Amino acid sequence: MTKITNDLFLKAARKEQVDRIPVWYMRQAGRSQPEYRKLKEKYSLFEITHQPEICAYVTKLPVDQYGVDAAILYKDIMTPLPGMGVDVEIKSGIGPVIHNPIRSFQDVEKLTMFKPEIEVPYVLDTIKLLADDMLDVPLIGFAGAPFTLASYMIEGGPSKNYHQTKSFMYREPEVWAILMEKLGRMTANYLIAQINAGASAVQLFDSWVGALSRADYAEYIRPVIEMIVREVKAVHPTTPIIMQAVGASHLLAEWETMPLDVVGVDWRETITSARKKVPTKAIQGNLDPSTLLAPEKCLKEANRILQEGVLEPGYIFNLGHGVFPEVPPEMLKKLTNYIHERSEILLKKDDIK
């Protein structure tokens, strides 16, 4: 395995002292990079993710080009679902479309057991390739969390309100619990397999869970998240686990009492406020990705965020959501350099101004 010479991200995830703030970006791989767009002219997303050499190349690009302190595996949260019998298609301009949406207990019953080594060997081969030969920074593996996966599976695709998902959850609580159990087992096995293959940390993406109240989260979702985290930690107790959601500030207190290591927040929550709600966790975030299209505003916001981030150990600079395709790659490089240089100055100061 290649030696990790830049461990800033891992130190921050463990709430250790660092000499500069680590930075990486959700959806940093692909998206706006010209090299990626050339690949997309020749290969589909499916083809890229199923070819370890190409997928590893795309994953490594932002490390080389932007100088970020961690790589995140280039995959889609839908990747494991076909291995459970879900007929999913990624449609350009739409996103994931499920051709056999869940409508009943019978549909949930049909979901099969997921074995990562059999169903997604190309994911594990990509990780091994990156960890063994290509990276000197930590590699972050990831999985979609059960609520977000279930919302696609029930709605049949992206949704603005999740009415079908929530009504199914309320109307069929016992069936919902079975669905969560199946998705939870899959997610735990998937994350464990990624760490076994060489991932240094893993992130749970629960993009849409902010649509739930805290009470509903505690009743319908928390048990399965606790199960996932518990199972991963039982096998890999020292591997950092990150929880990332959007519009979910009201759920921070739920995550404080779970054995998570890092909690990601978006621009609706300040770093200082988040720390008060999750004092034992490292914080990741929280620049609004829209500011990347307004360079002056972007750096001003980054400075404001950094001034809060450096006040305590355990801070990782990131976005509150993923990079937009319209973002110029040079802006991400400029921002990365700024975060490194500015945070190094701030961390040396006794009085932050």
From Swiss-Prot:
Q: Which InterPro entries match?
A: UROD/MetE-like_sf, Uroporphyrinogen_deCO2ase_HemE, Uroporphyrinogen_deCOase
- What is a single Pfam family found in this protein's UniProt entry? URO-D
Q: Which UniProt keywords apply?
A: Cytoplasm, Decarboxylase, Lyase, Porphyrin biosynthesis
* Record SUPFAM superfamilies: UROD/MetE-like
The record's CDD domains line, in alphabetical order, gives:
URO-D (cd00717)
Q: Which GO MF terms are attached to this record?
A: uroporphyrinogen decarboxylase activity
Question: Which Gene Ontology terms describe the biological processes this protein takes part in?
Answer: protoporphyrinogen IX biosynthetic process
Residues the record lists as binding substrate: 27-31, 46, 76, 152, 207, 321
Entry keyword annotation includes Cytoplasm: yes
EC number per UniProt = 4.1.1.37
Assembly and interaction partners:
Homodimer.
What is the role of this chain? Answer: Catalyzes the decarboxylation of four acetate groups of uroporphyrinogen-III to yield coproporphyrinogen-III.
- Spell out the protein name for this chain: Uroporphyrinogen decarboxylase
